[in-house]
Amino acid sequence: MEAYIRQKRATPGMVQASDLQLVRPMSGVNRNGREVHAYDGPMQFMMSPTNPDQIMPTSPVGPVPTVAVGGTGPNVTATSITTTPTSPYSDSTMEKLTPSSQDSEDEESTPVDVLPLPASTKSPANGGAGGAILYDRPTVDGHHLLSHSAPISPALNNNNHTHHTNSSSGNVKSSEDSGTPPSGGGGGAPDTEGDVIGPIEQWVTQPAAQGVLYKCRITRDRKGMDRGLFPIYYLHLERDYGKKLFCLAGRKRKKSKTSNYIISCDPTDLSRQADGFVGKLRSNVFGTTFFVYDSGTKNDAAAPRLDLAVVIYDTNILGFKGPRNMTVLLPGMTEDDQRVQISSVDDQQGLLDCWKSKNMDNVVELHNKTPIWNDETQSYVLNFHGRVTQASVKNFQLVHDSDPEYIVMQFGRTADDIFTMDFRYPLCAFQAFAIALSSFDGKLACE
């Protein structure tokens, strides 16, 4: 079964990360004229002042060495490799990493980068925190992306990450910066890594702050009598030194005509009656359309159920090989960064109804970023900037058509049951987690 799964992931329909270097096995240090510059020892020391692999949040950028590996096969050249100086922290303050965190932290520590946009006309903000300067967002068909006046995507300086693919030779060259997240506004300041503010129950439903990147991890638990068919998914917010904070858990209901996931802040009680119940994800019969609702009830006039997202997967009845195509609909944002309340309880007023009738005034439409075919690997590739390490049909990045370099969300596999999930404004943790769960669910008309 494991060999079959590995063979399936190697099919052309899988989406691979384009920023991974090709690893070729070598039986000796020097053979056939090869010369490898490396140090003999484990690839991750314990946290100590002499740890060459340690990455501190405030580490300055060191000199720019160049490492070249010669021989047959494609050439891979890395420049601007950062070196970490002696840690200013003492050994007593460092947390001892577990083997599992050591294996996955190095490849998942680089945040998502975005590319610069053309200069936009500045307009002062009337709302938002701290009187921040807002920029006029580009429009599509006369409609703004987030609101009447929303901040433009982060802009990068000349030293930030860019990725190029040479289609003629297949050689891939990557030039990376120190791993600092890109700016969340027009001032050039880098994105800060987000953390939980306030109670978990409230934070998971609040839209992400502008200029903040939230890096999360989803684990799938398939242990137990019935978890092979009904696994439990856990969402954790990643922190420094391999630490993580539990945020949400989700599981498919057993007795339901369609796929129906209960999402809760309490991992021990995944039911609608639980105090930690946040909302649910429900699909249609064919598994092509998924609806994300909050914790409200359908027939409650005082607190009606709100539509938080709709995920639409393009049908693939003929079975063509290739990545999935998906459309995500979100409620629009006001000038004070709050969601517009949209409810499908009212006839023809839900997110899907507005999208079908082309009434997009209060709706944000996102699409998955189109992967690029790589002739060398014979697969579709996307640049996940080190956050995704395994090919999977589930890997995707969400962008808006007017700003395709501002990655609102990305999701991908790093192990058999471990996935990374990063999201930004205007998504919240609950919306992003529900969108990721829709990728796990089986789709009769999409595979």
UniProtKB/Swiss-Prot annotation:
PROSITE patterns recorded: TUB_1, TUB_2
Region (Disordered): 71-196
Family: Belongs to the TUB family.
Record keywords: Cytoplasm, Nucleus
Main subcellular location: cytoplasm
Gene: king-tubby
A GO BP entry: protein localization to cilium
Keyword Nucleus assigned: yes
Organism from which the protein derives: Anopheles gambiae
Cellular component GO terms held in the UniProt record: cilium; cytoplasm; nucleus
Cystines in this chain: none
Top-level division of the source organism's lineage: Eukaryota
Name this polypeptide is given: Protein king tubby
Keyword Nucleus in record: yes
SUPFAM superfamilies named in the record: Tubby C-terminal domain-like (SSF54518)
